[in-house]
């Protein structure tokens, strides 16, 4: 089963609101006056300003825009990967109340049919155990622990636009890029932003070219023989340690 992600809704007048955040720190006028000017400026002019502000590194203005997403029939692995992003809100179809034996599952691309058959037989067996436990009176909230992480999940997710840019890049270029399902979700979000919110389609592949996906570490942190200097220590350190056990 192939899952997908959809942008459901965005803050009203998103470009005008973000552009207002970019204007207020340098433009004369009250907050209401600046917002009115942004509305009057129009989409094209606001998007041009947003691009200029973002290119200067002031990405916090994106936080004035909120985006609501739906994830349909994605794996629980994808669900849990996304829930790691704590600057977002999630509401997930509950495994405590809904029956998931017929939820379907996401199957990886296998190099041969034998591996695929073993995988699918194993998953179907786990679904069968889940059904058997429920039929035996085991509560759903306990039976759910035998479900595989590939079974399909559905949930809503809301986050500010700055976090969305971060999430899209993590999916397309960061840790998520190693898993085809996650990389596909990231590319889908970028494609939707390019159509609906072009100022959010900010790709940052260069940020992930380091081996660990972060900025280069200082050389001294990578050197195992780097010197360590003891700045201070108690006079009788050994005595203090021994007294703690007497």
Q: What feature does the model see in each segment?
A:
Residues 1-246:
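A conserved ligand/cofactor-binding region detector
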